[in-house]
């Protein structure tokens, strides 16, 4: 909820905001006025702070205390506690609280408890009492301690309650904060955060936001990247994208003397963070130094195996995980068990039971932990996800493992990244690591009786096709049958065992979420439509092979959907969720399967001239489904991408031919434009061209090359000479050979990947730069002939230049161009008329200008066209003061997608596609690869 502070904050001008910066722990001279003036010129997205408003310049910073036992809803029949205590009682409370903090005597603590049980009261900074001001002083000192203990670049800010009208909201305006002076983005995000207020007792996600959820539930919440949230879950999402904010953790702050939550500490950073244990530990120690508390965190000690039976069970489980992962190349498999309880601080002072994770939200409820039990990792990249699992826990019904635990049946989900955070607390990490298919099964051992062991297997990230997933699942089940000795599959009800058949697996569908959610890449942002409802379907395959729908709806927050039309978000880990199963014999509607059956090849051909994404949008399917439909029709690659590549080859060949004196009269080339008239099969386009008859080849003059994706296609260029030229077999072979030579340095783009998708993270890194705007490489026809510079005769036939003396003009490209140059040494060397082609100018100059963006930094330097990727990375690393190997470089391809530069062939194609002497690149951090290739504990 975004609230205008000028209309809601009382007592303006009575308190001052402070911050902690570098240099001896001195407070930064940041108040609301200074910050607003600093960023009054910030771009319109997000909106700048209102510099002219005087009513919010220095809002008060109250901290409030209340006893939960007396906190009654306003609409309840019972009389509510008075908003403020009488003066005498309030004075007594202040005196007792102050005395308690000084001596911590049992007598004074009991006195405070007695007053708390009688009155609901609020202590504010603006009442000028020593006790109320002490809250802010202690928080400020705690942040000083934290600043001294960390060297990370981050923003730490405090959210504290303030009265707005007749209710209380959380605000960070006027509260202490720690800020890295080097990060302008975090400073801007701090200024934006001061404009927000969040409810302390709201009933929907939009009102609560991240600070409100943490304050209300009194448990931490964290994510590797806030851009995985929806805008409902995280109202500051657009600002986070604009200012390159990623990792965030929010912790409740308790005052043990009054047993209440008094504030929320939020840690914000511009890098993606997987493990927050170190930061949380430092915050907790800093708070303890000033007699405040937060969620405790302990190192995870190895579980002591107290009997041989448990040890034998874990050894057998480890064997199963290892065999299945190694045989089927699964990236990760792990075990969840009902967690061991320990005592932690809960609700500010009460001792409750919690699991080993530092979340601390289970409060004695049944939950599962994956720490210190058997697991197996094959893909080293998944160690980060494994570490995140250790820090989290799952309650009954959360994630695939939680559902296997509560349903007592094997469960499978085709795409766990489609869950909401409430249904699967690890969903942000699943999106970050590109995980999709997941299978879980609950086992018991004859050695340990009723002890449950939930085995969780993650399918390879590239295994997303439904048929491939089903085949792999069947193979996993068959292998597990052979491995089970003392372990048995947990049955449902009176059934002791469930046969390991795919017909007995519960298929967890999230179709309601799929229709409203999409991701821009495997690491990209979360987007949702307003109508998403957060329900999900569970399908059971009966003995006849038919799916039985089991609807499992989570009624988590009353009237949430009706009031907010957003995803319900209550407790971050879903402890308030309740499962209700409604069985139905009616098979569920599968929108994706229906679309696949109805989209024919004839329909697809109508969209071949445009981009795949635009075609998918027009047909009402996602790009992934569109690619699957193409594969079913034998189309391995979207045609317009191939046409673009052929056109680039034609342009090269044209320049080679023109370098021979008098060749302009004999040859006339043009790009391939117009709608695609011939079916595209599994064979390559070049083979189709070779086999095509002269009449069919003549029709190719009307083929269209994809231009600007958001603009209309260019008019077909008519050229009769193309049919004559293209009908000759020799030209086809020459064209293919030239392309082969240009691509021989591993030009398959395996590392670039046509599936690479433009992430909002990447766009945010380039915010404000031209590369972030709609910049798409134009077709060769237009890049070689700018309309405003070329005569009318040239625009009609873009590749036919005026009959002027020609000199040698060859592109120094991969091998073939240099070799061909030697064939024309006898050509007359005459002055060459400079073309309008940016590509030609770039190659003639021998150098290009590189503009590389990294977070808020942009570096610019000249680079030789013949340089290698290694040399390019060295130049970037030297200027950004980074280590080579710790970052990736990406370029914007002709589909407006950020593609990784992995080899010299990618760099060559980048220069081809750019068509300009200025090449813009994006530099991003490499995800941490932790640990070795496999491991286990038990």
Curated annotation (Swiss-Prot):
Recorded coiled-coil stretches: 640-662
Keyword field contains DNA-binding: yes
GO cellular component terms, semicolon-separated: nucleus
PROSITE patterns: PB1 (PS51745), RWP_RK (PS51519)
Keyword Lipoprotein among UniProt keywords: no
Domain PB1: 847-926
Predominant location: nucleus
Compositionally skewed regions (Basic and acidic residues) per UniProt: 580-597
Composition bias type Gly residues, residue spans: 12-26
Compartment(s) of residence: Nucleus
Domain (RWP-RK): residue spans on this chain: 585-666
Keyword annotations from UniProtKB, A to Z: Coiled coil, DNA-binding, Nucleus, Transcription, Transcription regulation
Gene Ontology MF: a single term: DNA-binding transcription factor activity
Extent of Low complexity compositional bias: 748-762
Region (Disordered): 1-26, 557-597, 743-769
Function: Probable transcription factor.
Protein name in the entry: Protein NLP3
């Amino acid at each position: 909820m975004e609230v205008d502070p000028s209309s809601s904050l009382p007592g303006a001008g009575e308190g001052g905001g402070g911050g902690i910066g570098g240099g001896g722990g001195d407070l930064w001279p940041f108040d609301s006025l200074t910050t607003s003036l600093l960023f009054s010129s910030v771009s319109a997205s997000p909106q700048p702070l209102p510099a002219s408003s005087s009513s919010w310049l220095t809002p008060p910073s109250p901290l409030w205390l209340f006893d939960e036992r007396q906190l009654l809803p306003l609409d309840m029949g019972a009389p509510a506690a008075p908003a403020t205590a009488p003066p005498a009682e309030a004075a007594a409370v202040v005196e007792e609280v102050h005395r308690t903090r000084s001596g911590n005597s049992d007598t004074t603590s009991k006195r405070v408890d007695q007053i708390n049980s009688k009155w609901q009261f609020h202590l504010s900074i603006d009442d000028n009492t020593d006790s109320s001001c002490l809250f802010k002083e202690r928080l400020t000192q705690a942040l000083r301690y934290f600043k001294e203990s960390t060297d990370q670049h981050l923003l730490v800010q405090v959210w504290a309650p303030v009265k707005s009208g007749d209710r209380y909201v959380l605000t960070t305006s006027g509260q202490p904060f720690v800020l890295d002076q080097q990060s302008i983005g975090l400073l801007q995000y701090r200024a934006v955060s001061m404009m927000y207020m969040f409810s302390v007792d709201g009933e929907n996600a939009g009102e609560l936001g991240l600070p409100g959820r943490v304050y209300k539930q009194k448990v931490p919440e964290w994510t590797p990247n806030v851009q995985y949230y929806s805008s409902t879950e995280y109202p500051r999402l657009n600002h986070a994208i604009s200012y390159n904010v990623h990792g965030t953790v929010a912790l409740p702050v308790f005052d043990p003397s009054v047993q209440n939550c008094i504030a929320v500490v939020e840690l914000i950073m511009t890098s993606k963070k997987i493990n927050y244990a170190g930061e949380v530990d430092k915050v907790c120690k800093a708070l303890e130094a000033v007699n405040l508390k937060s969620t405790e965190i302990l190192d995870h000690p190895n579980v002591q195996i107290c009997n041989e039976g448990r040890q034998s069970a874990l050894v057998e489980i480890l064997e199963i995980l290892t065999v299945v992962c190694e045989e089927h190349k699964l990236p990760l498999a792990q075990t969840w068990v009902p967690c061991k309880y320990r005592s932690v601080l809960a609700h500010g002072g009460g001792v409750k039971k919690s699991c080993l994770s530092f979340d601390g939200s289970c409060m004695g409820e049944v939950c599962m932990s994956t720490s210190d039990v058997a697991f197996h990792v094959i893909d080293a990249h998944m160690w980060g996800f494994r570490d995140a699992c250790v820090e989290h826990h799952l309650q009954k019904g959360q994630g695939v493992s939680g559902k296997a635990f509560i349903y007592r049946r094997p469960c499978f989900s085709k795409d766990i990244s489609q869950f909401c955070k409430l249904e699967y607390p690890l969903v942000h990490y699943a999106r970050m690591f590109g995980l999709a298919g997941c299978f879980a099964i609950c086992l018991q051992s004859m050695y340990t009786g009723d002890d449950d062991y939930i085995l969780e297997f993650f399918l390879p990230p590239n295994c997303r096709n439904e048929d491939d997933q089903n085949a792999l699942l069947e193979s996993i089940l068959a292998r597990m049958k052979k491995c089970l000795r003392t372990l048995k599959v947990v049955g449902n009800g009176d059934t002791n065992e469930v046969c390991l058949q795919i017909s007995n697996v519960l298929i967890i569908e999230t179709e309601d979420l799929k229709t409203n959610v999409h991701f821009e890449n495997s690491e990209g942002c979360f987007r949702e439509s307003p109508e998403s409802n957060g329900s999900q379907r569970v399908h059971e395959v009966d003995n006849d092979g038919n799916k039985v729908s089991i609807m499992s709806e989570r009624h988590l927050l009353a009237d949430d959907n009706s009031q907010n039309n957003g995803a319900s978000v209550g407790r971050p880990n879903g402890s308030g969720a309740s499962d209700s199963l409604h069985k139905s014999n009616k098979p569920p509607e599968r929108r994706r399967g229906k679309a696949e059956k109805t989209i024919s090849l004839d329909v697809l051909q109508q969209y071949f001239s445009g981009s795949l994404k635009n075609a998918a949008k027009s047909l009402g399917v996602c790009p992934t489904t569109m690619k699957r439909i193409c594969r079913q029709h034998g189309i391995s690659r979207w045609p317009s991408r191939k046409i673009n590549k052929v056109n680039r080859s034609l342009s090269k060949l044209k320049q080679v031919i023109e370098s021979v004196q008098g060749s302009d009269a004999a040859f006339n080339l043009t790009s391939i434009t117009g709608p695609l008239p011939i079916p595209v099969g599994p064979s390559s386009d070049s083979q189709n061209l070779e086999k095509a008859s002269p009449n069919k080849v003549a029709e190719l003059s009307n083929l269209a090359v994809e231009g600007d994706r958001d603009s209309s296609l260019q008019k077909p260029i008519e050229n009769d000479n193309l049919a004559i030229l293209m009908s000759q077999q020799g030209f086809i072979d020459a064209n293919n050979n030239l392309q082969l030579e240009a691509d021989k340095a591993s030009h398959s783009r395996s590392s670039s990947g046509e599936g690479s998708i433009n992430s909002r993270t990447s766009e945010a890194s380039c915010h404000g730069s031209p590369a972030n705007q709609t910049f798409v490489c134009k077709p060769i026809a237009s890049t070689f002939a700018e309309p405003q510079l070329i005569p009318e005769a040239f625009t009609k036939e873009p590749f036919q230049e005026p009959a002027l003396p020609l000199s040698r003009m060859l592109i120094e490209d991969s091998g073939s161009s240099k070799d061909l140059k030697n064939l024309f040494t006898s050509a007359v060397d005459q002055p060459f008329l400079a073309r309008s082609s940016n590509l030609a100018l770039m190659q003639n100059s021998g150098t290009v200008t590189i503009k590389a963006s990294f977070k808020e930094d942009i570096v610019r330097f000249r680079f030789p066209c013949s340089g290698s990727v290694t040399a390019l990375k060295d130049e970037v690393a030297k200027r950004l003061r980074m280590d080579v190997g710790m970052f990736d470089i990406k370029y914007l391809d002709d589909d407006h997608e950020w593609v990784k530069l992995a080899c010299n062939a990618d760099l060559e194609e980048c220069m081809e596609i750019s068509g300009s002497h200025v090449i813009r690149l994006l530099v991003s951090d490499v995800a941490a690869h932790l640990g070795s290739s496999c491991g286990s504990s038990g």
